[in-house]
């Protein structure tokens, strides 16, 4: 049975690690938050004293951290993990980071004889808990096949996006589109209600018409339209607005690097930055509804 080092047990990492335990894998886990470690230990994992300790004897290293600087620090610092992971180890980096950062870590890992994949995920905390995540994978196809059983223990859809960094490119493209669709849905909902339509009726009309999209299907931003959506619990839980702003920033970095025109992505980033200034950083990203009707969700 493979020994897995899992580093980063936040809202996404913890349920992903739990599903690996359920699949029978042996886990050595580390997080800076002790309560997160304790929860995994209670589920059957072993606790490491440090990230460096976690990777000792590991066949696979999985990391799930907040941002590029954390991931680069973990692997590339003077005493970073790449200096302590045994050659031949498979490294799965599942955080959402800049494609340039992913490529930098890929190159450093390859120099040390490590097989690495950038494998950001989509599906949110619910998908992480249910084991239905989508993995967007960048890197060597042979390494992906070795990692496939692990991905299948945590997710439902596994896509090989392309070479080093391609998983991260796919992720920022997806999340930019998600933000634009959510903003458009929120704007349309506010317009219709302001002109006398009942919110649930309007939502159903649009859902079944050419404007239909994921937000209208399962994540409507108008409170009360969908009982289980974050909008109906004061925008708590879900995918925080500050994380969407981070991902939109990564998309803009990629756009600048490739001289791509992304006016909608740029506007979306401006709107989410405005939400952060208004104090909604830790609310679900569907809280963008408040920019179009500030009375909603109060």
From Swiss-Prot:
Return the Gene3D superfamilies for the record.
N-(1-d-carboxylethyl)-l-norvaline Dehydrogenase, domain 2, NAD(P)-binding Rossmann-like Domain
Reactions catalysed, as given in the entry: L-serine + NAD(+) = aminoacetaldehyde + CO2 + NADH
Active site, UniProt feature: 171
**Which annotated residues bind NAD(+)?**
2-31, 65-66, 96, 246
Q: Enumerate the InterPro entries for this protein.
A: 3-OH-isobutyrate_DH-rel_CS, 6-PGluconate_DH-like_C_sf, 6PGD_dom2, 6PGDH_NADP-bd, HIBADH, HIBADH-like_NADP-bd, HIBADH-related, NAD(P)-bd_dom_sf
- Any Pfam family hit: NAD_binding_2
Q: Which GO terms describe its molecular function?
A: 3-hydroxyisobutyrate dehydrogenase activity; NAD binding; NADP binding; oxidoreductase activity, acting on the CH-OH group of donors, NAD or NADP as acceptor
**Consequence when changing residue 96 to A:** Almost abolished activity
A Gene Ontology biological process noted in the UniProt record is:
L-serine catabolic process
| Effect of mutating residue 171 to A | Strongly reduced activity
Enzyme Commission number(s): 1.1.1.387
What does the record give as its pathway? Amino-acid degradation
Result for mutant: residue 247 to A? Almost abolished activity
Keywords from the UniProt entry = Branched-chain amino acid catabolism, NAD, Nucleotide-binding, Oxidoreductase
Q: How does it assemble?
A: Homotetramer, dimer of dimers.
Q: Which family does it belong to?
A: Belongs to the HIBADH-related family.
Annotated function = NAD-dependent L-serine dehydrogenase that catalyzes the oxidation of L-serine and methyl-L-serine and is possibly involved in serine catabolism. Has low activity toward beta-hydroxyisobutyrate.
NCBIfam families registered for this protein in UniProt: HIBADH
Q: What is this protein called?
A: NAD-dependent L-serine dehydrogenase
Task: Name the source organism.
Answer: Pseudomonas aeruginosa (strain ATCC 15692 / DSM 22644 / CIP 104116 / JCM 14847 / LMG 12228 / 1C / PRS 101 / PAO1)
The organism's taxonomy opens as: Bacteria, Pseudomonadati, Pseudomonadota, Gammaproteobacteria, Pseudomonadales
């Amino acid at each position: 049975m493979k020994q897995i080092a899992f580093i980063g047990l936040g809202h996404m990492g913890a349920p992903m690690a739990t599903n690996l335990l359920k699949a029978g894998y042996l886990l050595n886990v580390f997080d800076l938050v002790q309560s997160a470690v304790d929860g995994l230990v209670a589920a059957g994992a072993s606790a490491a004293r440090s990230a460096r300790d976690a990777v000792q004897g590991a066949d696979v290293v999985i990391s799930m951290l907040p941002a590029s600087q954390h991931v680069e620090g973990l692997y590339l610092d003077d005493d970073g993990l790449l200096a302590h992971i045994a050659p031949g180890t498979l490294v799965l980096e599942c955080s959402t980071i800049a494609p340039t950062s992913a490529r930098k870590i890929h190159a450093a890992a390859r120099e040390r004889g490590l097989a690495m994949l950038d494998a950001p995920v989509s599906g949110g905390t619910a998908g992480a808990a249910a084991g239905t995540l989508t993995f967007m994978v960048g890197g060597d196809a042979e390494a992906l096949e070795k990692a496939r059983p692990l991905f299948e223990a945590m997710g439902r859809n596994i896509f090989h996006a392309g070479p080093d960094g391609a998983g991260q490119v796919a992720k920022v493209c997806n999340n930019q589109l998600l933000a634009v669709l959510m903003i458009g849905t929120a704007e349309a909902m506010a317009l219709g209600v302001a002109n006398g339509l009942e919110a649930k009726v309007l939502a159903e009309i649009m859902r079944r018409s050419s404007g239909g999209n994921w937000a209208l299907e399962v994540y409507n931003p108008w409170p009360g339209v969908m009982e289980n959506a974050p909008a109906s619990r004061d925008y708590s839980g879900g995918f925080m607005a500050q994380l969407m702003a981070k991902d939109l920033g990564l998309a803009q970095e990629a756009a600048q690097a490739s001289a791509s025109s992304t006016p909608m992505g740029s506007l979306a980033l401006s709107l989410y930055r405005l939400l952060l200034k208004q104090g909604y950083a830790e609310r679900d990203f569907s809280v963008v509804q408040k920019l179009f009707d500030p009375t909603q969700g109060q």
